[in-house]
From Swiss-Prot:
<keyword id="KW-0178">Competence</keyword>
<dbReference type="GO" id="GO:0009306">
    <property type="term" value="P:protein secretion"/>
</dbReference>
<keyword id="KW-1003">Cell membrane</keyword>
<feature type="transmembrane region" description="Helical">
    <location>
        <begin position="143"/>
        <end position="163"/>
    </location>
</feature>
<keyword id="KW-1133">Transmembrane helix</keyword>
<dbReference type="InterPro" id="IPR047692">
    <property type="entry name" value="T4P_ComGB"/>
</dbReference>
<keyword id="KW-0472">Membrane</keyword>
<comment type="function">
    <text>Required for transformation and DNA binding.</text>
</comment>
<dbReference type="GO" id="GO:0030420">
    <property type="term" value="P:establishment of competence for transformation"/>
</dbReference>
<dbReference type="InterPro" id="IPR003004">
    <property type="entry name" value="GspF/PilC"/>
</dbReference>
<keyword id="KW-0812">Transmembrane</keyword>
<feature type="transmembrane region" description="Helical">
    <location>
        <begin position="296"/>
        <end position="316"/>
    </location>
</feature>
<dbReference type="InterPro" id="IPR001992">
    <property type="entry name" value="T2SS_GspF/T4SS_PilC_CS"/>
</dbReference>
<comment type="similarity">
    <text>Belongs to the GSP F family.</text>
</comment>
<keyword id="KW-0813">Transport</keyword>
<dbReference type="InterPro" id="IPR018076">
    <property type="entry name" value="T2SS_GspF_dom"/>
</dbReference>
<feature type="transmembrane region" description="Helical">
    <location>
        <begin position="93"/>
        <end position="113"/>
    </location>
</feature>
């Protein structure tokens, strides 16, 4: 709407007509805050918008391109929602199968396996090694579940008591070292940093002033700390491309893009084009891993179902052979 000539307040009033009561009440409060002089990004933050979307609008108010940046933040949120919906569709049926097989495992452990074991003991039959292994598995499955619960609880405790107390740079370093996840984190860092730096440079700000814009925001602590580090290195006489090149948090080709952009005199354009390439790579990797995850889950479910059948058939065949 703002791109079509509406003021921000007029656009919000029109949106209010299409919302439910709770959303309309939030929007009314937002309009009041804007009239009182609150920045638009603070209004979004108070409404619990995604922090990356809030960040985009913060930088937009710095360089004066709020309509275009609102479109960018909307597209970012739409992509995140679409990826989350795709993941839900992929996982919905496999998770239902896992739940069903888990119920079957419980019935086997609590009813069927004890009956087979009692029959073997009452008839003085010897069990084969495969049957012993199946019985032992179901006898100790509770221990496996307890260990999984303890492991999950341990991760939660570590996150709240240790991870959250670390510095933003240290938190990001831990995330980057996680297999598979780390590559996606580096790609997103490169995408977000290059896109926002491009917008700030396009508005006429210098690299130093653009980094100061990153430094003075409060809702993206990692980028604030990164800006502080980069500013200190620039003051020491180091170029921004060499400072980025030595960082573990970005793709290695980001520094090359910055160097090429400075040589061509169109750093803002080079960074924006690079950010779109990175966005395509992110979407490709998300689709790739979603496609890999579903067959893996189906394979796990198939193995569980096979184990269920073996646990019932193997003891029966052995009993028939010994009779």
């Amino acid at each position: 709407m703002t791109a079509g000539g509406y003021t921000l307040l007029d656009g919000l009033r029109l949106m209010e007509l299409q919302m439910n009561k709770r959303q309309a009440a939030d929007l009314t409060d937002s309009v009041t805050c804007l009239r009182e002089g609150a920045p638009f990004y603070q209004v979004l933050k108070s409404l619990s918008f995604h922090k990356e979307a809030v960040g985009i609008c913060y930088f937009a108010e710095t360089h004066g391109e709020l309509p275009a940046s609102m479109i960018q933040s909307g597209e970012l949120l739409e992509r995140k929602i679409a990826q989350a919906d795709q993941l839900k569709r992929v996982l919905r049926y496999p998770l239902f199968l896992i739940f069903t097989v888990a119920v079957m495992f419980y019935m086997l452990q609590s009813i069927i396996i004890p009956q087979f074991s009692g029959i073997y003991q009452s008839m003085n039959m010897e069990t084969s090694r495969s049957t012993d292994m199946l019985f032992a598995f179901f006898q100790h499955i509770d221990l496996v579940i307890i260990l999984l619960v303890l492991f999950t609880a341990g991760i939660g405790i570590y996150y709240w008591l240790v991870f959250k107390k670390k510095s933003p740079a240290r938190q990001m370093l831990i995330c980057i070292r996680i297999p598979l996840v780390g590559k996606l984190v580096k790609l997103f860092n490169s995408y977000f940093f290059s896109l926002q730096l491009s917008s700030l440079l396009k508005s006429g700000l210098s690299i130093y002033d653009s980094l100061n814009a990153f430094k003075h925001q409060t809702f993206l602590p990692f980028y604030r700390c990164e800006a502080e580090q980069l500013i200190e290195r620039l003051k020491a006489g180091e170029s921004i491309e060499s400072a980025i090149c030595g960082s573990l948090f970005y793709e290695t080709d980001l520094s090359k893009v910055i160097s090429h952009g400075q040589l061509s005199g169109r750093l803002d354009r080079e960074l924006f084009t690079y950010s779109q390439f990175i966005l395509q790579r992110l979407e490709h990797k998300a689709q790739k891993w979603t496609g890999i995850l579903q067959p893996m889950i189906y394979g796990f479910v198939a193995a569980m179902i096979l184990l269920v059948y073996l646990s019932m058939l193997v003891p029966m065949y052995q009993m028939m052979n010994q009779m």
